[in-house]
């Protein structure tokens, strides 16, 4: 039995969960999210009001989908109650970020500024010219836009310049030794 999949997902007060067949919809103080659960997996409510995810049998595919489905449903509940935030930072001389309206404008050593528009449900916040955060209720969207931003200028293994997640350790390489 999946150790993650068998745990019920607690539903906090103020969160409304609707289950219609394979579709799970969660409405909370921060917004509404929905998920289409894979076919053999069954999602239901138990007596205490928690969400329970079960599988019909122990086939390999069903076992792998069991824990995944439970985690995705738990992410919906956490997203509409607390939301998700990814903090990022920029290293490098002349590298900086600014908020223009709702867009992020990066100066990353290219001949032009790079502008990133937030997708629906995502907000940007700039704390300093080298630190910013990506926030939203959908964990997948927050992670995806953070990865797209990081890809604009990946951290350099020799000098460490680039966009990175806060606290991310970059493997540094030793440069060539001079004669």
Curated annotation (Swiss-Prot):
Pfam families: Ribosomal_L6. One of its GO terms (biological process) is cytoplasmic translation. GO terms for cellular component: cytosolic large ribosomal subunit. GO terms for molecular function: rRNA binding; structural constituent of ribosome. Disulfide bonds: none annotated. The keyword Acetylation does not apply. InterPro entries: Ribosomal_uL6-like (IPR000702), Ribosomal_uL6-like_a/b-dom_sf (IPR036789), Ribosomal_uL6_a/b-dom (IPR020040), Ribosomal_uL6_bac-type (IPR019906), Ribosomal_uL6_CS (IPR002358). Keywords: Ribonucleoprotein, Ribosomal protein, RNA-binding, rRNA-binding. This protein binds to the 23S rRNA, and is important in its secondary structure. It is located near the subunit interface in the base of the L7/L12 stalk, and near the tRNA binding site of the peptidyltransferase center. Part of the 50S ribosomal subunit. Belongs to the universal ribosomal protein uL6 family. This is Large ribosomal subunit protein uL6. It comes from Mycobacterium sp. (strain KMS). The lineage of its organism: Bacteria, Bacillati, Actinomycetota, Actinomycetes, Mycobacteriales.
